[in-house]
Amino acid sequence: MASSPALTVLYPGSFDPFHNGHLDVVSQAVELFGNVVVAVMHNPDKPSGLIPLAERVQLARQSTAHLSGVRVDAFAGLAVQAAAVAGAHFIVKGLRTPGDFEVEQQMAHTNHSVTGVRTVYLPCRADQAYISSRFIREIAQYGGRIDHMVPASVASALAGIFGKPSGGSEGSS
């Protein structure tokens, strides 16, 4: 099969924290398109989150450092604006459940009507369908095991935030 020129795609999210499901979507996007801009988004209308924006960027960079063709940057505003700034041909979104599709499809139609950018959906691996940043934060807060859900740098950062171990034998969540 002849290789096609690489395309750039934008993978936006709050990534609070970046987890293995996110990493899987980035890996799939690199394989399919060649270049991925992980857009760590700041939404001034939402609470600032557990992890400060600059640290979320750093954790995503550490988590994707082994992948070629990946750039991680912080963006504010709309994902379609970030896509334009990044020179992205598409926005990539990961899907875990039918509910994710319903929400993302509305956003995709809106984004396309605003700028013409299209959204590509990538399914998460079945063994990661249960992973969410919200659940990871809650489990980490109570000292539960998260090392199988997040890259090591993220587990360490959350252990530092909550002052509790993140991957020992404390029992399951």
Locations of regions flagged by a protein language model:
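Nucleotidyltransferase catalytic core that binds NTPs
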Residues: 1-173
